[in-house]
C-alpha cells in the first residue's frame, strides 16, 4: 500500500502543469455522471394519472395532406378507442388524391368521425397552423388530443389515458411516440426519438419548453382560444406544437406521461412525422 501511494505521489509530481487538466477532467466526469443519474431519476419517476369520478369529452384532431392510404390504414385505430365521449376531427389540407373518398367511406362505419377541408385553391394551402386552427374551432370538447395520420395509438385506451392526466391546473399533456420496436431498419430514428423524449422530460422538470411532439400531445381548447391560437406566428408551417406548448405553459402545468397505454406508434413507411 505504501509503495502504491509513493508511486502515485511521484506520478502526480511529474505531471507538472498537466495536473490541472487532470483535475478538470475529473470534475467534468463527475458532473457528467451526476447529470446522467439525475436524468435516470427523472425518467424513472412516475407521474400518476388523476383518479377522476367523471371524465371529460375529448376531441382528437388530425390533419392530412394527400395521405389517403395512411387514412385508410391508421384512422380506424383512432376511431376504435374505448372511451365514451370523444370525436375524431380530420382536417383535409388541400388534398388532391382520394382523401375525400376515403373519409366518406370510413365515416359510414364511424359516426364519431367529423371532417373539414381546406380546398386546394386557397392561398394558405401549406400552412399547418391554419389546419390545426380549423380543427380546434370545429372541436366540441375542451380537451384537444393531437396526432398525425402517419401514426396510430398503441392501445384502445390512448384517449382515456391521456385524458386522465388533466385536471383544472393542467395546460398540456405530452405522450411518447416512436417507431415500432420490431422494425429493424429504423433503429437510429427510434433511438433519436427515445433520447429526444428523455430530454423533453428533463426540460419539463426544469420548466423549459423548447420542443415537443405533435404526434402525441393534448391541451385545452379554452387556453388555446385565450391565447388567440397561433396569431403571433400563423404563417410558419413548422413548429406548431413547439409554439403552442410554450405559450400554454403560462396557463398551467405541462405534464408528460410514460404510461404504455398512451404510446403512439409511427409508421416506418412515412417519415414525415419527423419534422414535428
Where does each model-flagged region fall?
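Catalytic donor/gating beta->alpha subdomain of glycosyltransferases that bind UDP-sugars
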Residues: 166, 172-195, 222-225, 229-276
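N-terminal membrane-anchoring/stem segments of glycan-assembly enzymes
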Residues: 1-53
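Acidic donor-binding segment of Leloir-type glycosyltransferases
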Residues: 76-121
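Cell-envelope/extracellular polymer assembly enzymes that use nucleotide-activated donors
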Residues: 56-59, 87
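Short aromatic/hydrophobic "clamp" motif used to bind/position activated sugar donors
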Residues: 144
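Glycine-rich, basic loop-to-helix element that forms the pyrophosphate-binding segment
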Residues: 119-139
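Short, well-formed alpha-helical segments that are part of the catalytic scaffolds
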Residues: 43-45, 67-80
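Acidic donor-binding/catalytic loop of UDP-sugar-dependent glycosyltransferases
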Residues: 98, 148-164
